[in-house]
Amino acid sequence: MEKNMAWNEPSDSEKDKDPWNKKDKKLKNFDENKKSKLYLFLEIECLVNFLKRKKKIFFSESGSFKYFKNLITMIIFTTIIFLIGSGFYFIQESEYGVVTCFGKFSYLANPGLHWKPILIQKVIPIDVSTVREINTSGTILTYSEHFVQVNMTVQYRIVDPKKYLFSVTNPDNCLRQSINSALRSVISRSNIDIFLKNEFSLLAKNDIKVNIQKIIKPYHMGIVISDINFRTLYLPQAVKLAFEDIFSAIESKKQSLNEARIYSNEIKSQAFYNAKKILIEAKSDRLRTILNAQGIIFKFLKILPIYKSSKKITTIQLYFDCMEKIFSHTRKVLTNSDNNFFLFSLNDLFLKNNYNSLTQSHSNSNKHSSMLNTVSSSHVKSIDHVNSNNLLISSNNIINQRKLNSFRKDYLRIGRE
């Protein structure tokens, strides 16, 4: 069965001959940016067809009517040519053309030569490479409740012409209000100190830029903030004078603290050095005391078996050793009965008086003969040592003897007056 068709729809064989069908195919092959050129060709084609159909009417009447008709035709033709020629426009390299059709956005025209139907489309060129500026100024209250005079310039650039024109009614005014809001928000959280130290322009520039971007983001304005510059940023004169004394006192305080810190570090380092020195001396004294004690113990252990075998001889020897230490540092001079200046130790007296008894006791006991020789030899050495010391005392004065005594390390003794 044949398919039912509408009365005004051409058949399949006649579709290729239908001019309106061809026109629809042409429209489908062009993109949105090339519609304006298609409108131009369609209008020219319609004008030519109109003149062909009306040719008989214009040229078949009488002379006066024919002249009038030709004049009207010429005017209409000239007007159409003028309208067609006026539709050409050129977009600069740094611009984009926002094309609207009866007030509605149609497309963006790229840089170059274009054509638009007059009275149907409108083109608004938008510069997207030039950096624009907005100035704002005012007196703003800080966090510490002080007023600050601010004069600031914000540089921005348009990145989306469509959003810039159609997102908000007045993008410049909206951006100005956003800048004021961001500036007041940052300054209201800042203390007066950073303004007095001229540090606000360095610290708050990035914060203000971020706040402006956050404010304008929901509006989709198609704007990017490039830079922020503070032309003037100062405190009122009355506020500045009131804070000069305060900041001078703060600087004096910091200087005093630094000096105190330096002095404290010096004292700590000196105390640390002294403590370390005392510890080293204490360790050396401890070691010396231990070694002396070990020497005494060793000496005692060496004498102990001799003392057990011969208590009397050992007692006399120990007594001699003790008296040697005592009288080797005495300043008393002992002479003989003739008052000759002959120095000798008290040990000599004891030895002369007891020499015979000692020899007899040693000869009676062969067991202790070797021990006696050892004791006698050591005793003789001690006698020679004492005599040499006494001779040194006689040759030098008391002060030199005190100096010599100060170098002795075996024991500590305080001299008598």
Swiss-Prot record:
It is found in: Membrane. It comes from the Bacteria. The chain crosses the membrane at residues 71-91. Its main location: membrane. Residues 1-24 are annotated as: Disordered. Keywords: Membrane, Transmembrane, Transmembrane helix. It is a single-pass membrane protein. Residues 12-24 have a biased composition (Basic and acidic residues). One of its GO terms (cellular component) is membrane. InterPro entries: Band7/mec-2_domain, Band_7, Band_7/SPFH_dom_sf, HflK. HflC and HflK may interact to form a multimeric complex. Belongs to the band 7/mec-2 family. HflK subfamily. HflC and HflK could encode or regulate a protease. This is Protein HflK.
